[in-house]
A protein has these predicted regions:
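Nucleotide/phosphate-binding catalytic cleft detector across ATP-hydrolyzing
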Residues: 1-82, 100-102, 125-127, 134-179, ...
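Glycine-rich phosphate-binding loops at beta-strand->alpha-helix junctions
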Residues: 38-39, 137-140, 205-229
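Residue-level signature of catalytic and energy-coupling elements of molecular machines
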Residues: 50, 85, 118, 193, ...
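Short, ordered loop/turn segments at secondary-structure junctions
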Residues: 62-66, 98, 106-109, 134, ...
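A short acidic Gly-Thr/Ser loop motif
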Residues: 83-90, 96-99, 107-112, 214-219
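A conserved active-site cap/scaffold subdomain adjacent to cofactor or substrate pockets
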Residues: 108-130
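Phosphate/pyrophosphate-binding loops at sites that engage ATP/ADP/AMP, CoA/4′-phosphopantetheine
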Residues: 190, 194-209
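Conserved phosphate-binding/catalytic loops in two-lobed NTP-binding clefts
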Residues: 228-257
Length: 301
């Protein structure tokens, strides 16, 4: 299923890289279209789920495209930027340059893989592992990690659930062991990021800034870890606060939500939405051409 068909590059008389050809004169106009596709069945299931809630679906927007509206600045889009959105199960990577979207890739890995690794390593419940990751997890080691003991259970839940592997009598583990598990999974994820960016030509001098978004970007120290792994500047993308949205939504985990609002407000060009009635299907000459011009004048003036 086609989600988007948007102009990536315009060409005027053989000159590439024209951002907006409106108002320019040329003998020949060309356009390279970036098409975003997805499996049809999951998209239709999502649409039906929304419609079951008695809501209408105006459009389906790819998450990387929406997040870019919330987290990437126009200057970054122009100079070259890669947006890496770390979700629960999937990490989406989009590359932008010259103000246009140039490539998209998805990696079937996400922050849930870190949670599962913690649960497996310490033999604890997944809910306990998720709490450890969010509260005490970090992508950067500290000299005090070996001496710092962190409780596996949340306050008020002492004695519940299994005793963690390697824990003390109070069911506490060394923070260094937790950080080791987190960084091991992150190393695998950043390796996939590096390969995907290279496949899209975002490497060496052709690459630029990297922006992290998604719930996985809220892990402590992840920007520094990814920057060291990819060898380029990395920042955390935080969406702007919108009137009517809670303050808690101005975090990387809600980048897609805020981006959907901004995308709908911007209403970018999609080739599929262009009215075919304004596209000539045959050549006009003589009186036919004159009549065509007069018809256009009447329609617009």
């Amino acid at each position: 299923m086609v989600l988007h068909a948007q102009p990536a590059h315009y060409t005027l008389d053989g000159a590439h890289g024209v951002a907006n050809p409106a108002g320019l004169h040329a003998e020949a106009l060309g356009v390279d279209i970036h098409v975003t596709v997805a499996e049809g069945a999951p998209v239709r299931n999502l649409i039906e789920a929304v419609q079951t809630a008695h809501l209408d679906v105006e459009a389906v927007v790819a998450s990387p495209l929406a997040s870019a509206y919330a987290c990437v600045t126009p200057e970054e889009r122009e100079l070259g930027v890669a947006l890496i959105e770390i979700g629960a199960q999937v990490t989406n990577i989009s590359v932008h340059s010259a103000g246009m979207l140039l490539g998209l890739k998805s990696i079937p890995l996400g922050s849930n893989d870190i949670t599962d690794a913690i649960a497996s390593s310490f033999g604890i419940r997944r809910s306990q592992a998720e709490r450890l990751k969010c509260v005490s997890g970090s992508a950067m080691a500290s000299p005090t990690d070996h001496s710092e003991m962190i409780p596996v259970n949340a306050p008020g839940e002492e004695g519940e659930g299994p005793i963690a592997r390697g824990a003390d009598e109070h069911n506490r583990i060394a923070r260094a062991e937790l950080v080791a598990v987190v960084t091991d999974r992150l190393a695998h994820l950043t390796g996939e990021m590096h390969r995907s960016l290279k496949d899209m030509g975002f490497s060496g001098s052709r690459g630029g800034q990297v922006v992290l978004a998604g719930g996985g970007a809220e892990l402590h120290g992840i920007a520094e870890f990814v920057q060291a792994a990819l060898g380029r500047p990395v920042r955390i993308g935080k969406p702007p606060r919108l009137q009517g949205l809670p303050e808690a939504h101005a975090t990387p985990g809600f980048a897609s939500l805020v981006g959907l609002c901004l995308y709908a407000a911007d209403d970018p060009v999609d080739i599929r939405s262009v009215d075919p009635g304004y596209q000539p299907t045959r050549r006009y000459s003589g009186f036919g051409l004159v009549n065509r011009v007069l018809q256009a004048v009447r329609e617009y003036f």
